[in-house]
Amino acid sequence: MAAKFLRFSYMSNNAPHRHHYVPRMVQRNFTNESGGLHFWRRGMNIGEVRITKPSNLFVEDHLYTIVDKNGARDHSIEHWFGRLETLAAPFIQQFLNIVRHGMTPIMNGTHWDLWHIYVYHAQKRTVAWHKRFLTPEDLLAVMKEIASEQQWREHIRAWETDAEDTLREMNNARIASQADPMPDKMLVEFRSRGLVIYVAPPQTSFILGDDMSGDALVSSRGGTTDARRVQFMPIAPDVAVGYCDTRGVHTDHLTAMDVRRMNEAMAKQSYLIAGRSKAQIASLSRIPYDPPDIMKGWFKSRNGALPACLP
């Protein structure tokens, strides 16, 4: 299964130029009865909430497009993400149906690996943050970290000769890395973990943000009195998921305050938030902005850390 959808074909020119960094198949799980999502983005007035369709949210032009030196555009990575989402979408819907009937999903090895790979690449789809926040100097710092001494000298010469073309190549490399397969060592680590299903109580709902996952302090459980930190990824208004140290699939029924804290954590790190409730999004628009340190996260991942949805 993993090998099937990790195969990659280059030089595909027939693709939409609008690329979603939060998949529409996830966004559609959050829409209201009319198929819309309430949203707010920084720069809008506090409390000013609008509504639109998933096709217009969490999207940028040519986000995953590689450009050659002649200006030709290659959309292979967008096609690749589309194939991955085509595999993940029916699995997620079946998963949600089981949870909503009060049952615990039974996952075989194929299900687990599909989920691990989907989560891994969902975490890597922070290219929008890279594009918005990283400077050429940041990209050079990344290059220096991964290059040999000889490669670094060659890169500096190229930068001094043609900075614009060198920056294009650096951007291409950063974009292409989104489709790099999960390292075998990391997949082994994923397989050693369990899955927690976080269920929101009635009259509450999760939101979506720029990053598909977050972490928050929630109430205690199991007789303890201390708050606990959980890392989670919302996949529907009533369901989020995360990893844990105990193998198997586990269900965690949250309180309304838990969901609020998790939504505040998502809003705090996001430029754009969206959800089913207009009043909820208006309230969360008051949360101050504290975006994640991308460079710190990148260097941490280079040292073998697991993605953010893992404890």
Segments the model singles out, each with a brief description of its role:
Residues 5-311:
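Alpha-helical structural context detector biased toward long hydrophobic helices
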